[in-house]
């Protein structure tokens, strides 16, 4: 690597809204505040919810279904 062209790395703290604190190396230089992390993200915790959009589709077809028929 060429000397003098790379940004300096510093250890920062990334704090999640769930209270999880992660120490990482970064070039940002200041602490980060996260909305979600691996400890509270629904995909990783297994608390995913299936969103049923059937009601929305029926509502759309009810409002605009007659426009397509001639």
Swiss-Prot record:
This is Large ribosomal subunit protein bL31. Keywords: Metal-binding, Ribonucleoprotein, Ribosomal protein, RNA-binding, rRNA-binding, Zinc. GO terms for molecular function: metal ion binding; rRNA binding; structural constituent of ribosome. It comes from the Bacteria. One of its GO terms (biological process) is translation. The gene is rpmE. Part of the 50S ribosomal subunit. Binds 1 zinc ion per subunit. The keyword NAD does not apply. Binds the 23S rRNA. InterPro entries: Ribosomal_bL28/bL31-like_sf (IPR034704), Ribosomal_bL31 (IPR002150), Ribosomal_bL31_A (IPR027491), Ribosomal_bL31_sf (IPR042105). Zn(2+) binds at residues 16, 18, 37, 40. One of its GO terms (cellular component) is ribonucleoprotein complex. Its cofactor is Zn(2+). Belongs to the bacterial ribosomal protein bL31 family. Type A subfamily.
């Amino acid at each position: 690597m060429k000397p003098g062209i790379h940004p300096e790395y510093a250890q920062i703290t990334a704090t999640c809204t769930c209270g999880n604190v992660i120490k990482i190396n970064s070039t940002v230089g200041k602490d980060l505040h996260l909305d979600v992390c691996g400890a509270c993200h629904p995909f990783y915790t297994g608390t995913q919810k299936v969103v049923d959009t059937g009601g929305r589709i029926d509502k759309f077809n009810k409002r605009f279904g007659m426009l397509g028929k001639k």
